[in-house]
Amino acid sequence: MNSRFTSAFTPFAVSLGLLLVMTSAFPTPGPLGEDFKNDTTPGRLLLTTPEKTEALIKRMVDKISAMRKEICEKNDECESSKETLAENKLNLPKMEEKDGCFQSGFNQAICLIRTTAGLLEYQIYLDYLQNEYEGNQENVRDLRKNIRTLIQILKQKIADLITTPATNTDLLEKMQSSNEWVKNAKIILILRNLENFLQFSLRAIRMK
């Protein structure tokens, strides 16, 4: 990590009480495949570029759009009632002004940390998608795999200045519903928010 990142991370990590995890050995370098699917082994260093990482995010956004379209084709009132969707409060990870990812007040170091933390928090919602999504399950599997790859890439940039959040199994239980419309509304809301989250993260990735 260069001195520019070090100086930016240190005060932020201290202010938020982030724990620096010291690794006992350096990870083994490995290339990132053209489809970002060749190796997602934890702890293995992925050799990539900002352009490839940006391409990975854009592919995920396209995948999410395809999944939303698939749901909408089966539901006449798809995404037509924002009020009803808002009632399904899922406490989804979102970008805020303080996260440094917006054009106003942009801070690459802070944005990278928030993006990584948010994607880790999204894992429980991806569990819900895998359990409840009735469309092409290959899309869900690809999305999860690509997000794990992106998390690995981002962790390399922030030198493990973040810890993995505990799995909230209670939340997964609370999200269950026997009502088909409510279930689809939650899936749409998760996909829509994840798409927005990834879009905001692109600004930090594009910075060399």
Curated annotation (Swiss-Prot):
Q: Where is the signal peptide?
A: 1-29
Is Transferase among the key words of this record? no
The UniProt entry, under Pfam families, shows: IL6 (PF00489)
Where does this polypeptide localize?
A: Secreted
SS bonds (residue pairs): 72-78, 101-111
Gene3D superfamilies, alphabetized: 1.20.1250.10
Residues with an annotated glycan are 38
Residues modified as Phosphoserine are: 81
| One GO MF term | cytokine activity
Any one GO cellular component localisation term in the record: extracellular space
Broad class of the protein's primary localization: secreted
State the InterPro entries in the record: 4_helix_cytokine-like_core, IL-6-like, IL-6/GCSF/MGF, IL6/GCSF/MGF_CS
Question: Which of UniProt's keywords are assigned here?
Answer: Acute phase, Cytokine, Disulfide bond, Glycoprotein, Growth factor, Phosphoprotein, Secreted, Signal
Instruction: Name the source's superkingdom.
Output: Eukaryota
What is one Gene Ontology biological process annotated in the Swiss-Prot or TrEMBL record? positive regulation of cytokine production involved in inflammatory response
- What is the annotated role of this protein in its UniProt record? Cytokine with a wide variety of biological functions in immunity, tissue regeneration, and metabolism. Binds to IL6R, then the complex associates to the signaling subunit IL6ST/gp130 to trigger the intracellular IL6-signaling pathway. The interaction with the membrane-bound IL6R and IL6ST stimulates 'classic signaling', whereas the binding of IL6 and soluble IL6R to IL6ST stimulates 'trans-signaling'. Alternatively, 'cluster signaling' occurs when membrane-bound IL6:IL6R complexes on transmitter cells activate IL6ST receptors on neighboring receiver cells.
* Family note: Belongs to the IL-6 superfamily.
Q: Report quaternary structure and partners.
A: Component of a hexamer of two molecules each of IL6, IL6R and IL6ST; first binds to IL6R to associate with the signaling subunit IL6ST. Interacts with IL6R (via the N-terminal ectodomain); this interaction may be affected by IL6R-binding with SORL1, hence decreasing IL6 cis signaling. Interacts with SORL1 (via the N-terminal ectodomain); this interaction leads to IL6 internalization and lysosomal degradation. May form a trimeric complex with the soluble SORL1 ectodomain and soluble IL6R receptor; this interaction might stabilize circulating IL6, hence promoting IL6 trans signaling.
- Name the chain's protein: Interleukin-6
User: Which species?
Assistant: Bos taurus (Bovine)
